[in-house]
Swiss-Prot record:
MF terms in GO: chlorophyll binding; DNA-binding transcription factor activity; enzyme binding; identical protein binding; protein-membrane adaptor activity
GO cellular component, as recorded: chloroplast; chloroplast thylakoid membrane; cytosol; photosystem II; thylakoid light-harvesting complex; thylakoid membrane
Tissue: Expressed in photosynthetically active tissues (at protein level).
Oligomeric and partner information: Interacts with GGR. Forms homodimer, and heterodimer with LIL3.2.
Gene: LIL3.1
Function: Light-harvesting-like protein required for biosynthesis of phytylated chlorophylls and alpha-tocopherol in green seedlings. Functions by anchoring geranylgeranyl reductase (GGR) in the thylakoid membrane, leading to the stabilization of GGR activity. Binds chlorophyll a in the thylakoid membrane. Plays a role in the regulation of chlorophyll biosynthesis under light stress and under standard growth conditions.
Protein name: Light-harvesting complex-like protein 3 isotype 1, chloroplastic
A single GO BP: photosynthesis
Outcome recorded upon mutating N177A: Decreases interaction with GGR
Length: 262
């Protein structure tokens, strides 16, 4: 129920600066009552209160504020980067550690097991030479470091000298001897046709002996057609420094002549 202010006295009505004061009462936390102001009726001279207006307070609305995600500090980023680098390095170390090594059933403890190369109770040295050549060819293509844990104990000196000659020298010697015999025969025939000196008489002639040594030396140095290119490369290497020296002096002379002309 609303409370009204006390009646206005006659003394206060006579005062022109007097402002009437009205009191409000709070009925509840959710409703406010606005008291009406009495007004004079022009006909009856009585006052009647106006209807009270009630205003409901708005209900509170829940507002959810989402906090922005906290940015990770730069230190954590650096730590993650270093962790990734360490992981990559670890993977590289693992890959480098898994190096393919030479494997052969006959290669045991850094040497060839000669018992596995035996044929009819004797060691087949040709097979040993072929196996060692294949191993060294593999090492050229896939270099492998030695260690004290797995030392290489095999030495080619254990292979007899006659096995080397039989393997490499005899087949090559047969080719060279056949080539030398053919060249010597045609040279002797050419000399005999020109001078009429026979083969026996040519052996006592200095010119014929010289041609014989030239033929033998040529057969030894030029065993294959590829050897001609090798000899050309060797000749170019022997004259390379001389050519460079002459080119340096030539450039200096050209520069000096150019400066004089200017």
């Amino acid at each position: 129920m609303a409370l009204f202010s006390p009646p206005i006295s006659s003394s206060s009505l006579q005062n022109p600066n007097f402002i009437p004061k009205f009191s409000f009462s709070l009925l509840s936390s959710n409703r406010f009552s606005l008291l009406s102001v009495t007004r004079a009726s022009s006909d009856s001279g009585s006052t009647s209160p106006t209807a009270a207006v009630s205003v409901e307070a708005p209900e509170p609305v829940e507002v959810i504020v989402k906090e922005p995600p906290q940015s990770t500090p730069a230190v954590k980023k650096e730590e993650t980067a270093t962790a990734k680098n360490v992981a990559v390095e670890g993977e590289e170390m693992k890959t480098t550690e898994s190096v393919v090594k030479f494997q052969d059933a006959r290669w045991i403890n850094g040497t060839w097991d000669l018992k596995q190369f035996e044929k009819d109770g004797k060691t087949d040295w040709d097979s040993v030479i072929v196996a060692e050549a294949k191993r060294r060819k593999w090492l050229e293509e896939n270099p492998e470091t030695t260690s004290n844990d797995e030392p290489v104990l095999f030495d080619t000196s254990i292979i007899p000298w006659w096995a080397w000659i039989k393997r490499y020298h005899l087949p090559e010697a047969e080719l060279l001897n056949g080539r030398a015999a053919m060249i010597g025969f045609f040279m002797a025939y050419f000399v005999d046709s020109l001078t009429g000196v026979g083969l026996v008489d040519q052996m006592g002639n200095f010119f014929c002996k010289t041609l014989l040594f030239v033929a033998v030396a040529g057969v030894l140095f030029i065993r294959k057609n590829e050897d001609v290119d090798k000899l050309k490369n060797l000749f170019d290497e022997t004259t390379l420094y001389d050519k460079q020296w002459q080119a340096a002096w030539k450039n200096d002379d050209d520069e000096s002549l150019g400066s004089k002309k200017k």
